[in-house]
Design a protein with these regions (language model features):
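Nucleotide-activated donor-dependent transferases that construct or modify glycoconjugates
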Residues: 1-14
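Short amphipathic alpha-helix
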Residues: 18-28
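A conserved mid-protein helix/loop that constitutes part of the nucleotide-sugar donor-binding site
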Residues: 19, 198-210
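Conserved nucleotide-sugar phosphate-binding/catalytic loop shared by glycosyltransferases and other
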Residues: 31-85
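A conserved nucleotide-sugar
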Residues: 34, 211-224, 229-230
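Short N-terminal targeting/anchoring amphipathic segment
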Residues: 88-104
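Conserved nucleotide-sugar donor-interacting segment of glycosyltransferase catalytic cores
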Residues: 104-152
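A nucleotide-sugar donor-handling region in carbohydrate enzymes
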Residues: 132-201, 227-228
Length: 231
């Protein structure tokens, strides 16, 4: 089975889209399925992390002169039409499943890829656009079927709410240990702060400024975060 991911990461965009796709891809690898990532080589991209996890990576070129009034297209670094054509040209093999995780891509892009793939799965959070896919995953708390009324095909399978959260295998292995520790904890002493890989708006710093004394605080922040020194 040939599975292709179309997902990006960058200093401006962060790493969240990529990390949840990696959770997917690592599980597919454990099942001996072939995985390929198609990523635009944006500034601050975490493409090397994908390679370290033994997934094939195909990089799309950067158009340094591209600009868009659309916030998400500006992050994407290309129009949907150009991105779709580059994605098609990047894949010479038949694709069994195309997994797309991008706020910038809607049915315009999906329809152009349809002839090249058997199935499309879209990971979404916003429910703010029309999407042409066979399966839609929104793992966020409170996401519901009504959010996607008239926005997806009638036969689209919806995977909604936290029941479908994309968590790495490590979380599952430690779940029983964590639950046992929670039962025996009477006072909170340790606090973990994680606001994403890049935290471009520096929410981490704001939180640290407002946490009282007497706690052991651990911060998780990516190496490319622009606010590392301040934190």
């Amino acid at each position: 089975m040939n599975i292709v991911f179309r997902v990006d990461s960058s200093t401006k965009m962060g790493t969240g889209h990529l990390m949840r796709c990696l959770a997917f891809a690592d599980e597919f690898n454990r099942q001996n399925k072939k995985t390929t990532f198609i990523c635009r080589n944006l500034t601050g991209s975490s493409i090397n992390l994908v390679k370290q996890k033994n997934h094939k990576v195909i990089t799309l070129p950067i158009d340094t002169g591209f600009q868009s009034d659309n916030f998400y297209l500006d992050l994407l670094g290309a129009t949907q039409e150009v991105d779709a054509q580059q994605t098609i040209e990047a894949t010479s093999e038949n694709i069994d499943l195309l997994i797309v995780d991008s706020y910038a891509l809607d049915e315009t892009w999906h329809k152009k890829l349809r002839p090249c793939v058997k199935k499309i799965l879209v990971i979404d959070d916003l429910a703010d656009k029309n999407i042409d896919c066979d399966v839609l995953l929104n793992q966020n708390l409170g996401s519901k079927k009504e959010d996607y009324k008239n926005k997806v095909p009638d036969d689209c399978r919806l995977l909604l709410d936290c029941e479908y959260a994309l968590l790495r295998l490590e979380f599952g292995k430690l779940r029983s240990q964590a639950l046992e520790k929670r039962k025996n904890t009477k006072r909170i002493k340790n606090i973990l702060v994680s606001m994403g890989g890049n935290d471009t708006k520096n929410f981490t710093y704001d939180i640290l400024q407002n946490v009282g004394d007497g706690f052991n605080i651990t911060v998780v922040l990516g190496m490319l975060s622009p606010h590392n020194k301040m934190v």
